[in-house]
Amino acid sequence: MTGSGTPSQGKKNKTVHVKCRRCGEKSYHVKKERCSSCGFGDSASRRGYAWQSKSGDN
């Protein structure tokens, strides 16, 4: 009966994120084919949210 505790964490050594073609961040998910930083592969517009900047800043 294998648990998901500390010994199992050592097996997590596969490459999940690689460098994104659009933003250059190491956030492009290989299996999902989507960048978690800029949204490349999922949307034509850049990923960004209002909560990422202080309220009132323009």
Curated annotation (Swiss-Prot):
Matches recorded under InterPro entries: Ribosomal_eL37 (IPR001569), Ribosomal_eL37/eL43 (IPR011331), Ribosomal_eL37_CS (IPR018267), Ribosomal_zn-bd (IPR011332)
Physiological role: Binds to the 23S rRNA.
Cofactor(s) this protein requires: Zn(2+)
Entry annotated with the keyword Zinc-finger: yes
GO terms of molecular function: rRNA binding; structural constituent of ribosome; zinc ion binding
Residues covered by region (Disordered): 39-58
Lineage top rank: taxon: Archaea
Protein name: Large ribosomal subunit protein eL37
Keywords of the record: Metal-binding, Ribonucleoprotein, Ribosomal protein, RNA-binding, rRNA-binding, Zinc, Zinc-finger
The keyword Glycoprotein appears for this protein: no
Protein species of origin: Halorubrum lacusprofundi (strain ATCC 49239 / DSM 5036 / JCM 8891 / ACAM 34)
Family the entry assigns: Belongs to the eukaryotic ribosomal protein eL37 family.
Any matching Pfam family: Ribosomal_L37e
Binding site for Zn(2+): C20, C23, C35, C38
Record HAMAP family: Ribosomal_eL37
Cofactor binding mode and count: Binds 1 zinc ion per subunit.
Zn finger (C4-type) start-end: 20-38
Gene that specifies this protein: rpl37e
GO cellular component, as recorded: ribonucleoprotein complex; ribosome
